[in-house]
């Protein structure tokens, strides 16, 4: 018997693609120019990112896999029966499948919901899951943003009283500034954990590595350049769907990677190849100077003091930690701080 892939539920509250151009204009007309993260996660962008994250030098994924292979059963044991497990940005399924298999082995009746911006990536990922092997774990897919996912958790009546386990794998929290990371976790805690605080949790991966050579090897590994440049093609298609004009000529740009010691973060930017660049309509008044950085991504690293501050500011406490020898990455189970 063939078991069909789970349905993909559209939980988007607003037109995502209609909002990205506004964010592009806002970011490129500031003194310190930026591009929004959403611009980098088109279907092509996600495919390039998956290739990059599978590169030999990209240690975060390899370390997460190492930990999950060793500790998935303990993670699964910490998740309450009848939980709704929400994967906030599912991307590649090869990591989370280890946790799902452990939940199945423990006969945990849970519903796994993968949240992603890309409909086609959700469909592709679920086609690769052997759902017929699972009898206790049920599957669903959610098409939307982080905010859409939190809104759905708060407002869908049939799931309101179930325990929740929010998965933030892939060093997702590191993509936010430290203040914004605390705000994001606090928002998740208030939206998703408060209905069943003693049984609900967040499982988040964080990276403590601050060794520049290791970090720069990882973040310049194979696949990152096409990932970065795919954003420019996507921007052109959003502003000029007919393809008759361009804001960016992709050949004018290259990817720039650096470690910011003072802020404890890796920074990813686009820089012009060799000259000042005038952007195309509707940003023809914007000149990007030679060697001026357009930053699009940061990956913050967390030592113990920074982790403690993050969790405290978010109103959370760590209930469990899972890591492995020689790994800088670790998974933290966070619960609402009740006192």
From Swiss-Prot:
Name this polypeptide is given: 4-dimethylallyltryptophan N-methyltransferase
Assembly, per entry: Homodimer.
Any GO BP: ergot alkaloid biosynthetic process
Chemical reaction(s) catalysed: 4-(3-methylbut-2-enyl)-L-tryptophan + S-adenosyl-L-methionine = 4-(3-methylbut-2-enyl)-L-abrine + S-adenosyl-L-homocysteine + H(+)
Pathway per the UniProt entry: Alkaloid biosynthesis; ergot alkaloid biosynthesis
Database matches in NCBIfam families: methyl_EasF (TIGR03439)
Family membership noted in the UniProt record: Belongs to the methyltransferase superfamily.
Gene from which the chain derives: fgaMT
Keywords annotated in UniProt: Alkaloid metabolism, Methyltransferase, S-adenosyl-L-methionine, Transferase
Keyword Methyltransferase assigned: yes
The keyword Protein biosynthesis belongs to this UniProt entry's keyword annotation: no
EC nos: 2.1.1.261
Main enzyme class: transferase
UniProt organism field: Aspergillus fumigatus (Neosartorya fumigata)
Alphabetical list of Gene3D superfamilies matching this protein: Vaccinia Virus protein VP39
Pfam family, one: Methyltransf_33
């Amino acid at each position: 018997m063939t078991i069909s892939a789970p349905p993909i539920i559209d939980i988007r509250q607003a037109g995502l693609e209609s909002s990205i151009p506004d964010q592009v204009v806002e970011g490129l007309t500031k003194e310190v120019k930026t591009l929004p993260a959403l611009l980098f996660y088109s279907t092509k962008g996600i495919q390039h990112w998956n290739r990059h994250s599978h590169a030999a030098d990209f240690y975060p994924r390899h370390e997460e896999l190492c930990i999950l292979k060793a500790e998935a059963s303990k993670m699964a044991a910490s998740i309450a029966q009848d939980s709704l497990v929400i994967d906030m940005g599912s991307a590649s399924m090869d990591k989370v499948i280890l946790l799902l298999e452990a939940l199945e082995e423990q006969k945990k009746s849970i519903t796994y919901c993968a949240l992603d911006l890309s409909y086609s990536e959700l469909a592709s990922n679920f086609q690769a899951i052997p759902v017929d092997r699972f009898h206790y774990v049920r599957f669903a897919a959610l098409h939307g943003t982080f905010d859409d996912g939190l809104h759905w958790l708060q407002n869908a009546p049939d799931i309101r009283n179930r325990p929740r386990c929010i998965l933030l794998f892939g060093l997702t929290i590191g993509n936010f500034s430290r203040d914004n990371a605390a705000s994001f976790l606090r928002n998740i805690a208030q939206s998703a954990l408060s209905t069943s605080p003693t049984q609900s949790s967040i499982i988040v991966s964080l990276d403590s590595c601050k060794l520049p050579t290791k970090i720069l090897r990882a973040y310049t590994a194979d696949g990152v350049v096409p990932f970065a440049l795919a954003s420019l093609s996507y921007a052109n298609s959003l502003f000029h769907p007919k393809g008759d004009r361009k804001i960016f000529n992709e050949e004018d740009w290259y990817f720039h990677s650096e470690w910011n010691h003072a802020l404890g973060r890796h920074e990813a930017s686009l820089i012009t190849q060799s000259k000042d660049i005038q952007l195309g309509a509707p940003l023809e008044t914007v000149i990007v100077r030679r060697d001026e950085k357009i930053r699009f991504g940061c990956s913050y690293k967390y030592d113990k003091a920074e982790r403690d501050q993050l969790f405290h500011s978010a109103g959370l406490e760590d209930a469990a930690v899972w890591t492995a020898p020689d790994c800088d990455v670790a998974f933290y189970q966070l619960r609402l701080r009740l006192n």
